[in-house]
Amino acid sequence: MEHFDASLSTYFKALLGPRDTRVKGWFLLDNYIPTFICSVIYLLIVWLGPKYMRNKQPFSCRGILVVYNLGLTLLSLYMFCELVTGVWEGKYNFFCQGTRTAGESDMKIIRVLRWYYFSKLIEFMDTFFFILRKNNHQITVLHVYHHASMLNIWWFVMNWVPCGHSYFGATLNSFIHVLMYSYYGLSSVPSMRPYLWWKKYITQGQLLQFVLTIIQTSCGVIWPCTFPLGWLYFQIGYMISLIALFTNFYIQTYNKKGASRRKDHLKDHQNGSVAAVNGHTNSFSPLENNVKPRKLRKD
């Protein structure tokens, strides 16, 4: 294993240049193998988990979901505040910022982005909760691609460009995650669901985040500094892939749902009655044909 790791490190050095020594010896960042193994295990659980749960009752997970989402909300808020203050103290340049120009402020950014990398590992739990609750329709190509790729990308970011221009996307993403995980935490409490109206706008915020990241990254290409250009081109390409997938998700989830509701509403009027829609707006499906809802485990 050590020989393989040494060979891998030599290959990465030839491809990407020398690593940033400021993260040398840091947990999970010294070599790529643990991150790769975690990603493989994640993909195996995505594949095998639904098969294992097929003939089992779904778990509720309500209590642990509240704690989990609250924890990620607070972690995201901490990272956002620390990144903003670090950028302010280091007088970071919006258009392009190198990785060795702000002294101690760079180290502050690096320490926060280490937590950002760890948060991508923690967020694998999003998928595991979907599996345990048998919400398999939420395990989409977008969901798996985003979760699996972010952990791996940020291992490389932390080893080669752990500060400087790398801060912007992580700062925006941390802010979006404050909104997103607070929403998911509140939605875990049934009595709160009727008051949660902003899920649609979270997706819009995510799309705006990607567009702003492309704009800010492009500034580093147009007005270059000491930050490696190859990383900027890669980030632009990755953001484009996320925009394509999130736009498709948005259209499939909201535009088609709205068109379907308008069609059903018109049909109900033509039949001389209007159906109640509270079951849908409150995130519950109405019962039809006297079919009882399946029981959830209270684990």
Curated annotation (Swiss-Prot):
Pfam families: ELO. It comes from the Eukaryota. GO terms for molecular function: fatty acid elongase activity. Keywords: Acetylation, Cell projection, Endoplasmic reticulum, Fatty acid biosynthesis, Fatty acid metabolism, Lipid biosynthesis, Lipid metabolism, Membrane, Phosphoprotein, Transferase, Transmembrane, Transmembrane helix. Residues 275-299 are annotated as: Disordered. It is found in: Endoplasmic reticulum membrane; Cell projection, Dendrite. Pathway: Lipid metabolism; polyunsaturated fatty acid biosynthesis. The modification N-acetylmethionine is found at residue 1. It is a multi-pass membrane protein. Its EC number is 2.3.1.199. One of its GO terms (cellular component) is neuronal cell body. Its main location: endoplasmic reticulum. The chain crosses the membrane at residues 26-46, 64-84, 112-132, 150-170, 205-225, 226-246. It catalyses: a very-long-chain acyl-CoA + malonyl-CoA + H(+) = a very-long-chain 3-oxoacyl-CoA + CO2 + CoA; (6Z,9Z,12Z)-octadecatrienoyl-CoA + malonyl-CoA + H(+) = (8Z,11Z,14Z)-3-oxoeicosatrienoyl-CoA + CO2 + CoA; (9Z,12Z,15Z)-octadecatrienoyl-CoA + malonyl-CoA + H(+) = (11Z,14Z,17Z)-3-oxoeicosatrienoyl-CoA + CO2 + CoA; (9Z)-hexadecenoyl-CoA + malonyl-CoA + H(+) = 3-oxo-(11Z)-octadecenoyl-CoA + CO2 + CoA. InterPro entries: ELO_fam (IPR002076), ELOVL5 (IPR033677). The modification Phosphoserine is found at residue 285. One of its GO terms (biological process) is unsaturated fatty acid biosynthetic process. Residues 279-288 have a biased composition (Polar residues). Catalyzes the first and rate-limiting reaction of the four reactions that constitute the long-chain fatty acids elongation cycle. This endoplasmic reticulum-bound enzymatic process allows the addition of 2 carbons to the chain of long- and very long-chain fatty acids (VLCFAs) per cycle. Condensing enzyme that acts specifically toward polyunsaturated acyl-CoA with the higher activity toward C18:3(n-6) acyl-CoA. Belongs to the ELO family. ELOVL5 subfamily. Interacts with TECR. This is Very long chain fatty acid elongase 5. It comes from Macaca fascicularis (Crab-eating macaque). The gene is ELOVL5.
